[in-house]
A protein has these predicted regions:
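Substrate-gating cap/lid alpha-helix
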Residues: 88-148, 177
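Serine-esterase "nucleophile elbow" of acetyl-processing enzymes
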Residues: 1-15, 23-30
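Histidine-centered active-site loop/cap adjacent to the catalytic His
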Residues: 163-196
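Oxyanion-hole/transition-state-stabilizing segment in secreted/luminal serine hydrolases
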Residues: 19-61, 66-69, 81-88, 107-109
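A short helix->loop->beta-strand "cap" motif at the edges of active sites that frequently abuts
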Residues: 71-76
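Short secondary-structure boundary/capping segments
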Residues: 53, 92-96, 164
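The substrate-binding groove and active-site-proximal loops of carbohydrate-active enzymes
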Residues: 42-57, 114-125, 166-169, 173
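Hydrophobic/aromatic beta-strand patches that form the interior of the parallel beta-sheet core
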Residues: 11, 77, 146-148
């Protein structure tokens, strides 16, 4: 939807719950012709509990460096995590909620220890702050790099009207809301992907 609203043709390299800053994904993006690139980083790293804060920054730098090897000047928009209450301040891993399964419903819970964030476990809040800081530092030498806080697409104030049905994934109406907000933020005059 966002691509249609922006009048662009999208190539989607989303990996359905498995986007982990994998080098092969960055190499594919590097080698694929593109006028602009956006990458959303966050939730899969937390709910799979695959990385610690110490490794996160270097992994993001490496991912962006690889993309920039093939697209040194194209607009590159880094999008932080959307709001997800179960993982805002509680690390993963995420798991099926057994009580919900017992009722015939699918819901997710965060099984990590909130105190582990102070020892390097990732939460969405930690990722959001690290991404904002990392992109801000890189922007000094990369004027075509931009950051969009995922809260601007779906934040705490949206949760009451648009709750996550399974505590993790947005429903169809919320996807439309997120797509519309992305299009307005990215493609509007003055936006990081405007004029494509």
């Amino acid at each position: 939807m966002a691509a249609a609203l922006g009048g662009v043709e999208a190539i989607n390299l989303g990996l359905a719950g498995s986007a982990m800053l994998d080098p092969f994904t960055a190499r594919t993006m590097r080698d694929t012709p593109a006028d602009a690139i956006s990458v959303k980083i966050g939730i899969n790293l937390v709910n799979a509990d695959v990385m610690r804060a110490r490794a996160f920054g270097p992994a993001v730098h490496g991912f962006l460096d690889t993309i920039r090897d093939g697209h040194p000047d194209e607009p590159l928009l880094v999008v932080g995590p959307l709001y997800c209450p179960i993982h805002e301040d509680t690390p993963g891993p995420g798991a099926f909620d057994p009580a919900a399964l017992g009722r015939g419903a699918v819901r997710f819970v965060a099984t990590g220890d909130p105190a582990a964030a102070s020892r390097g476990s990732l939460t969405l809040s930690v990722i959001r702050q690290q991404l904002a800081d990392l992109v801000a530092a890189r922007m000094a030498e990369d004027p075509n790099l931009h950051y969009l806080d995922g809260h601007d697409l779906y934040g705490p104030s949206d949760f009451a009207a648009h709750p996550l049905p399974d505590a993790l994934h947005p429903d169809a109406a919320t996807h439309l809301l997120i797509g519309d907000r992305f299009a307005r933020a990215a493609f509007a005059p003055g936006g990081p992907l405007a004029g494509l």
